[in-house]
Amino acid sequence: MGAPDEVLNIAPDEGDKLRAKALAADAEELPAGYYTSPRVVCTFMSISLTLLSTYFAFEASAAAISFIIEDIGPSENVSLFSTVWTVSQSISILLMGRLTDRFGRRGFILGTNCVGIIGGIGCLYSFQRFNTMIGAQVLLGLAAGQPGACILFIGELMSNKTKFLGNVIVAFPNVIATGFGPYIGQSLGINGNWRWIFYIYIIITAVSTVLAFIFYHPPSFAQLHGKKISRRDELLKVDWIGAFFLTAGMTLFLLGVSWGGSPDPWDSPKILGLLISGIVSCVIFVLYECYAKIDRPIIPMEFFPGTFAGFGCMLLISGVMGSMNTALFIMYPQQVQHIFSSTLSSWQEVAWMSSTAGFGIWAGIVTLGSLFHIFRHIRWQLIFGSAWVTAFLGAMASVNRHKKSEAIAFSICTGFVIGWAEDVTMLLVQFISSDENLGVTFSVVSATRAICGSIFTAAFISLYTIKFPGQLQSKLVPAVPRRWGFPGVLLVAGFAYWRALTGQCPSYWLLFPGMTSNLIQVTNDAVADSYAAAYSYVYYFAMALGVIAIIASACTKDFDHYLTSHVPHQIYAAKDADVDLLDSDRSTENVSSAAVTVSEKE
């Protein structure tokens, strides 16, 4: 007897649609105890542990970077430490979409975990070579594609109306990374034990890998395509040319954006070369995807036209929320350091205050995510959430050295909705995607968030960098009493710029002739006020982006009718993972019902 596709005279693409229908289920029809079975529980544990280990390593190592440099030596490539991680994660997510839709998710999860462990080992053994650590960060960034896509891996296992509950379960332990990660990283750095950041990462990721290897058996290649199509045939259909142009364009452009302004000026040949070549590569990629008639495009262009109220709005909201997340997650700790460091008593107090935004983001995901499907009225939730974030970003613009309590409250309130709104867009886009294209649809929205975050990181940093010198001049000179004269102004100006560059105000400045504790206090206050004024422009900029999110939310289609019991994919026992459902005893029932659905869609 031939393969099911041959017996039923099914074309390969139509067979994929029929199998996608057969692989899906209604939550009420799943076997009793399915979600409490060891294979499902351990799958959730595996994905949750990888999420925790990845973002712990990222947050903790970023907090300990100064201690890492002090230990293994300085490098002109320090700015690449976080940049290559972000760029690599974006590329990993984009490529993950199409490849895992075609070849299955299991290999991607196991492969990225192994790549991450290798990257962690590379960080451990980067003795006296910071460039070795940069290379290891590339591997860690590629491995971070998996936790960046955990909303897909968990979402496809849950019904439409309970997807966010699955995300809440996985994200719950991540408070250790987002809330406590910077504090733990700085503490380990101060005690000379920064390598334990990567020991912890390797240990947790190894446990996650073992759990995934034993229990994680999502639809396999045979279940997705049958046994008529070989992996070699499918590999030949992959859009490798498009993948090359996309990877090259993204890498060049994001490196140019990240390096622009600091350490290199925007008009330098290096930055212009990176930006222009990156944009040209991305344009070539889009044209190639549109006109080359590829069987398996990396990003299908048909997603974009005529779907603004669905896919288009999700792209806009995801991009804006990613940018706002950047404004809060990256800029706020710097703001705390620049404005409040002279008034906070210890590094512990600085670290805890810098973590409030992370706690807010985690609390919002856990709290609002649990109520998402109960409140319904999704479009109004998006409108209210976008307006909430925009309003509190405006409140953040009012923060100065006299408003420490307000800064803590506003950062928590802003983060409370940002994390939830980011995740919502990546869940909602799964509602409007066919089950066989869940990965590629998700990857575009998720990568948009990361790309916009990188772009606006550079824009925000450039904005406050440009505004700060003028603000310092306008606030410092009037603050110096006339009786101190010109020498006092020069001394204060020198200290102010040194304080602005280093963020430190050690007592040995009192040894300079004419310098007094009053002069130091005046300088600290002027620098803090100048930074507060400069950062306010960043939040005004972010508010303008928030208006875009509000408009996109108002234009979003009604998603409430998608809150059904439909479950796209399941976790199987290992012995059932390679069974073609169209070749099973129930194939006739599956094929007949699936064929009706496919014909109705067409």
From Swiss-Prot:
Q: Which Gene3D superfamilies match?
A: MFS general substrate transporter like domains
Which InterPro entries does the record match to this protein?
MFS_Str1/Tri12-like (IPR010573), MFS_trans_sf (IPR036259)
What are the UniProt keywords, alphabetically? Cell membrane, Glycoprotein, Membrane, Transmembrane, Transmembrane helix, Transport
User: This protein's superkingdom?
Assistant: Eukaryota
Where, per UniProt, does this protein localize?
Answer: Cell membrane
Q: Which GO terms describe its cellular component?
A: plasma membrane
Which molecular-function annotation in GO is an example for this chain? transmembrane transporter activity
Membrane topology of this protein? Multi-pass membrane protein
- Coiled-coil positions are none
Broad class of where this protein is predominantly found: membrane
Q: Where exactly are the transmembrane stretches of this chain?
A: 49-69, 77-97, 107-127, 134-154, 164-184, 196-216, 240-260, 271-291, 297-317, 355-375, 380-400, 408-428, 450-470, 484-504, 532-552
- Which Pfam families does this UniProt record tie to the protein? TRI12
* Sugar-bearing residue positions: 160, 590
Task: Give the similarity note.
Answer: Belongs to the major facilitator superfamily.
Query: PANTHER family of this UniProt entry?
Result: MAJOR FACILITATOR SUPERFAMILY, MAJOR FACILITATOR SUPERFAMILY (MFS) PROFILE DOMAIN-CONTAINING PROTEIN-RELATED
Function statement = Efflux pump that provides the dual role of trichothecene export and self-protection by allowing the fungus to evade the harmful effect of its own trichothecene production.
Give the protein's recorded name: Trichothecene efflux pump TRI12
The protein's organism comes out as Trichoderma arundinaceum
